């Protein structure tokens, strides 16, 4: 197969993000102000003791650092062949779970040529067993070709396709019951953040997952602020960390302390090779879900290797 020299990333369109952080996080009501204030005070007081107990990687979740690459609806056979070649030659840190999600049409091509070091995910799956559902991909089909993960609740599925929280929760439950791991996406739109509804929106989306899923054992939560995708506004590490802390506390209060401790919460807002190291330093950022930058092999490798920013002295 011929290998194209053109970068797959060059097919992406839309405005590039600027470097300045966007400060728009406000609580939606006094009651939330009080609860979040006490929450953050509590977590600040306990952070030093939590860090002292982790000798290898400073991470709130107990699993490996997790980096997913979502290729979305991009690529041709030749361009994907070049991307896979770049990934196969990349040197990746060993203590990271790495997953990529190619377009469905190219899953077999990627499976046959990508290193076993990197797992392959579906970008979506149907809510039940396959059948007369034109254009959909079933969990059974993903399993049949050896896939172990699926991305559900991505902002483009929510806000472009129109999937609601409850439907996404049912999809997650079915995928988990059939043995797939789920990358469960949550996140607020720009107008929701500016209206002070960031936490409300994330909690509602989390609740839809919690109400439906049988277990959190094979779930990775991806916080994906929609306002940080193609808007020219970038979340600072501190803004991302604040929401991750709140998500973990919600899991503790509404699911269990064990789930809150073990669940990896990754960040998915315009992550690239230039900001991944600083983001990775935040304790509750357990990895990344990467869009455009995952289409460039060397840059994606840089993001995977950002785990080194998280390592602390024993």
UniProtKB/Swiss-Prot annotation:
UniProt-annotated stretches for the region Disordered: 1-25
PANTHER family tied to this protein: TRIOSEPHOSPHATE ISOMERASE (PTHR21139:SF2)
EC number: 5.3.1.1
Transit peptide per record: 1-59
Catalysed conversion reaction: D-glyceraldehyde 3-phosphate = dihydroxyacetone phosphate
This protein's record includes keyword Chloroplast: yes
A Pfam family this chain is assigned to: TIM
Oligomeric and partner information: Homodimer.
SUPFAM superfamilies tied to this protein: Triosephosphate isomerase (TIM)
Localization: Plastid, Chloroplast
Biological pathway: Carbohydrate biosynthesis; Calvin cycle
GO cellular component assignments: chloroplast; cytosol
HAMAP family (alphabetical): TIM_B
Matching InterPro entries: Aldolase_TIM, TIM_sf, TrioseP_Isoase_bac/euk, Triosephosphate_isomerase, Triosephosphate_isomerase_AS
Primary residence: plastid
Note: In plants, there are two types of TPIS, cytosolic and plastid.
A GO MF term: triose-phosphate isomerase activity
Residues binding substrate: 70, 72
The protein's name: Triosephosphate isomerase, chloroplastic
Family in the record: Belongs to the triosephosphate isomerase family.
Biased composition (Polar residues): 1-22
GO BP annotation list: gluconeogenesis; glyceraldehyde-3-phosphate biosynthetic process; glycerol catabolic process; glycolytic process; reductive pentose-phosphate cycle
Key words, A-Z: Calvin cycle, Chloroplast, Isomerase, Plastid, Transit peptide
């Amino acid at each position: 197969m011929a290998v194209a020299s053109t970068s797959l990333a060059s097919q992406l369109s839309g405005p590039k993000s600027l470097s300045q952080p966007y400060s728009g996080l406000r609580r939606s009501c006094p009651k939330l102000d009080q609860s979040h204030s006490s929450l953050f005070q509590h977590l600040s007081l306990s952070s030093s003791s939590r860090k002292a107990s982790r000798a290898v990687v400073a991470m709130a979740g107990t699993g490996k650092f997790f980096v997913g690459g979502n290729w979305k609806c991009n690529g041709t056979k030749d361009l994907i062949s070049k991307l896979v070649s770049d990934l196969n030659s990349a040197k990746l840190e060993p203590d990271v779970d790495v997953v990529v999600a190619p377009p469905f049409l190219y899953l077999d091509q990627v499976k046959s040529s990508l290193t076993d070091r990197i797992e392959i995910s579906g970008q979506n799956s149907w809510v039940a067993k396959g059948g007369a559902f034109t254009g959909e991909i079933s969990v059974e089909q993903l399993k049949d070709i050896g896939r172990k993960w699926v991305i559900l609740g991505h902002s483009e599925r929510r806000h472009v396709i129109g999937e609601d929280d409850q439907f996404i929760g049912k999809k997650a439950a079915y995928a988990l019951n059939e043995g797939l791991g789920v990358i469960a996406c949550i996140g607020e739109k720009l107008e929701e953040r500016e209206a002070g509804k960031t936490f409300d929106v994330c909690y509602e989306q989390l609740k839809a997952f919690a109400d439906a899923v049988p277990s959190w054992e094979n779930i990775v939560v991806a916080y994906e602020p929609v306002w940080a995708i193609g808007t020219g506004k970038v979340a600072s590490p501190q803004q991302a960390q604040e929401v991750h802390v709140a998500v973990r506390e919600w899991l503790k209060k509404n699911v269990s302390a064990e789930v809150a401790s073990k669940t990896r919460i990754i960040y998915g807002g315009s992550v690239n090779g230039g900001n991944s190291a600083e983001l990775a330093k935040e304790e509750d950022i357990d990895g990344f879900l990467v869009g455009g930058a995952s289409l460039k092999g060397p840059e994606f490798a840089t993001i995977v290797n950002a785990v080194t920013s998280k390592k602390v002295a024993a």
